[in-house]
Amino acid sequence: MSSHADSKPWTVPALAQAKRDGRKLVMLTAYDAGFARTFDANGVDLILVGDSLGMVVQGHESTLPVTTADMVYHTAAVARVLERALLVADLSFQADATPERALDAATQLLQAGAEMVKIEGAGHKLDVIRYLVEREIPVCSHLGLTPQSVLRFGGYKVQGRGEAGEQLRRDAQAAVDAGVSLIVLECVPTPIAAQISAELRVPTIGIGAGPGCDGQVLVMHDMLGLDSGHRRPKFVKDFLAEGGSVAGAVQAYAQAVRDGSFPDAEHAYAA
């Protein structure tokens, strides 16, 4: 467990300080009080109530059917039991279609206990980000493979190869300029993710983006080796197999992120 775990709850400013200190951030998804309590007590710094719940909890084929009401329900359940982890919640599909809609959804999530909201994509979403930040709502930007864009991408594929890598760098910097406090990079080649992480003043959290990010996140079902009904991505590792219990798996995952042993080349994408 990190030294921060023994001191005080995580805050948004503490995330930036962790990056300056070179301390890796450990993030996991959670959707209910039971798992959230266990994760919080065993070294997880940030908990994400992700719209991934559409697939791993509700049994859908994608995140698209998830509603703001779904997100609020699960966010509130998780928030009730957290003592130290910072709680991030996703804006669901099209909840961020306009700044006004995003503000309404984000307000509901913060009232339910979230401390930051996550928005997928850049481009026109930058106006949404600025609108929320100007109204004192912390924002995390999700770049690379954005699951809400699965139809446009034609499936779950690595993003940021070749010239697309330069656009990803520009998008990340634009998101920081718009005021985000955190960036998630998903399914991005290791060199590009490392370069982006080195260039930005805010922390990056990788998922299939290599060890050069400032932290890592996994969907809890993947970290525990549970069958989600979908193909296992390359970046997934079953920590329950070596941890022996849920708490042990979380501790093993947290330690591997902090000491840099996860992700290794086997669980990342080359350029």
Curated annotation (Swiss-Prot):
Biological pathway: Cofactor biosynthesis; (R)-pantothenate biosynthesis; (R)-pantoate from 3-methyl-2-oxobutanoate: step 1/2
Binding, 3-methyl-2-oxobutanoate: D51, S52, D90, K118
Entry EC number(s): 2.1.2.11
Species of origin: Xanthomonas campestris pv. campestris (strain B100)
Principal subcellular localisation of the protein: cytoplasm
Cross-referenced SUPFAM superfamilies: Phosphoenolpyruvate/pyruvate domain (SSF51621)
Biological function: Catalyzes the reversible reaction in which hydroxymethyl group from 5,10-methylenetetrahydrofolate is transferred onto alpha-ketoisovalerate to form ketopantoate.
Cofactor: Mg(2+)
Active site: E186
Binding site for Mg(2+): D51, D90, E120
Gene3D superfamilies reported in the protein's UniProt record: Phosphoenolpyruvate-binding domains
Lineage: Bacteria, Pseudomonadati, Pseudomonadota, Gammaproteobacteria, Lysobacterales
Name of the protein in question: 3-methyl-2-oxobutanoate hydroxymethyltransferase
NCBIfam families (UniProt xref): panB, PRK00311.1
InterPro entries per the UniProt record, alphabetical: Pantoate_hydroxy_MeTrfase, Pyrv/PenolPyrv_kinase-like_dom, Pyrv_kinase-like_dom_sf
GO terms classed as biological process: pantothenate biosynthetic process
HAMAP family in alphabetical order: PanB (MF_00156)
GO MF term (any one): magnesium ion binding
Gene: panB
Pfam families, per database record: Pantoate_transf (PF02548)
Subunit structure: Homodecamer; pentamer of dimers.
Cellular component annotations (GO), alphabetically ordered: cytoplasm
Catalysed reactions, semicolon-separated: 3-methyl-2-oxobutanoate + (6R)-5,10-methylene-5,6,7,8-tetrahydrofolate + H2O = 2-dehydropantoate + (6S)-5,6,7,8-tetrahydrofolate
The protein's enzyme class: transferase
UniProt keyword list: Cytoplasm, Magnesium, Metal-binding, Pantothenate biosynthesis, Transferase
Cellular localization per UniProt: Cytoplasm
Similarity field: Belongs to the PanB family.
Textual note on the cofactor: Binds 1 Mg(2+) ion per subunit.
